Amino acid sequence: MKVLVAGSTGALGVPLVRALAAGGHEVAGLTRNPANRARLRALGARPLVADVLDRPGLLRAVDGLTVDAVVHLATAFRDMPMRHHGMAATNELRTRGTANMLAAARAVGAGRFLAESMIFGYGYGDWGDRVLTEEDPPFGPPGRNAGLEAHVAAMRESTRRTLTAEGIAGISLRYGGFYGPGPASEAIVELLRRRRLPVLHGAGVISLVFIQDAVAATVAALERGRAGQAYNVVDDEPVAWRTFLRALAEAVGAPPPRELPAWLLRPANYAHAAFTTSMRVSNAKARRELGWAPSVPTWREGVPLIAAALRNAA
């Protein structure tokens, strides 16, 4: 299969490009930064330089290229966003960027288009013990909070464009929180080491996914995903943020996180929303239709792998 990957040097893009190339696929990696060319070649990809938000430049970059599938993973995450404005660039990549990538997909003759989304698209807040599936209405009730609505609206728009695209099999992947060796956990580990990431009293449950399992699910969706479908890509056991962060801090030798009442994090309004959301998400559809299952089923197996990778890199 010939695959074009946007966001090819990101936390998910790098291991995905590596896995696709190792699996015998021809990969073109889209990057905004010319300095990433050598890195993409080392991963086994043909580098293409363009800004996803610049449609004319993007179409020039892919001119003459022919692929079977396009994977749109482009985000603007560099560090963990703390305030709503830290999500603005990613929101634009999910709206205008998705529209531009669909135009590029048509230009290169792609038959499949996969777009990144997040389980937070179900809506920030406390879902209690309810287990969310793809049958649940995504994107929550609009208007509850202007900042949160901007993020949810961007995911809503990306998914709508992806799943209703004419002449192309569009698939939306709703990833859980990424963690694992390398960039997937570097920001959190650094914040824990500096005691800059507290645990909040009584707050927050999240469905995570180990980064290599996110890669495997993406490859499975490329090969077996159904057109017009969304898939939750999460592990088998939701975990309280406080439990996960304490375990990760201990495993990597960081000091125990400070404990704070949740209201003290409100000035960091995006982080407050993310860490106080309680969300349990099912991966049954991805298991059933993609033939995928997480190799790291829970955080209990995943946290030691992060610690081991850090020791090996030291």
What are these regions (language model features)?
Residues R32-R41, A45-R96, N100:
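NAD(P)H-binding glycine-rich loop region in Rossmannoid oxidoreductase-like domains
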Residues V3-H25:
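N-terminal Rossmann NAD(P)H-binding glycine-rich loop of SDR-like oxidoreductase domains
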Residues M82-M87, N91, R96-L148:
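Conserved Rossmann-fold NAD(P)-dependent oxidoreductase catalytic core, especially the SDR/UDP-sugar
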Residues P297-A314:
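Amphipathic terminal alpha-helices
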Residues G140-G170:
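Active-site Tyr-X1-5-Lys
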Residues D126-W127, R156, A165-I168, Y179-V189, ...:
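Glycine/proline-rich active-site loop of Rossmann-fold NAD(P)-dependent oxidoreductases
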Residues F139-G147, A187-V209, D213:
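A conserved pocket-lining segment of Rossmann-fold NAD(P)-dependent short-chain dehydrogenase/reductase
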Residues R18, A217-A271, R311-A314:
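Mid/C-terminal beta-alpha module of Rossmann-like enzyme folds, strongest
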